[in-house]
């Protein structure tokens, strides 16, 4: 199994995702996703954990369930990611980081040039303690990227809606 990852790539690619001049309505949770959460004893407002497996090119969304533990909600195939297996260690290394990252509503961008996007908060506490550097590492839509993790618009819209309600 590949190392666990959270967002990655080139800072130039991710930070160029400025706000569009036209505001758009952010994606909302579908009734289907609400039913999936309910079936797994999860509430929409429960905390979220996102992890990405580089080798498998998969993004997982985990939420706290009624037991108070994180449980897997859904796995999504990724369109693109850059770098190689192994951790990100410094700003500008074009390497995707590997670790666990807590996503909060303040890290969401509903006006991304790539549909919607969110920052996964690299570096996490362990990476900071190790002296790893980097910022503005995103997951976004449009299934095209020169650095960040890219998903289809429908995938990132659903993930965005899950995170926004947390």
Per-segment meaning from a language model:
Residues 2-10:
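Bacterial N-terminal signal peptides
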Residues 10-36:
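Bacterial Sec signal peptide processing site at the extreme N-terminus
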Residues 31-49, 61-63, 80-91, 98-105, ...:
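N-terminal post-signal-peptidase region of extra-cytosolic proteins
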Residues 51-53, 140:
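Well-ordered beta-strand positions
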Residues 65-81:
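Short Gly/aromatic-enriched secondary-structure transition segments
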Residues 92-166:
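Exported/periplasmic cell-wall-interacting domains
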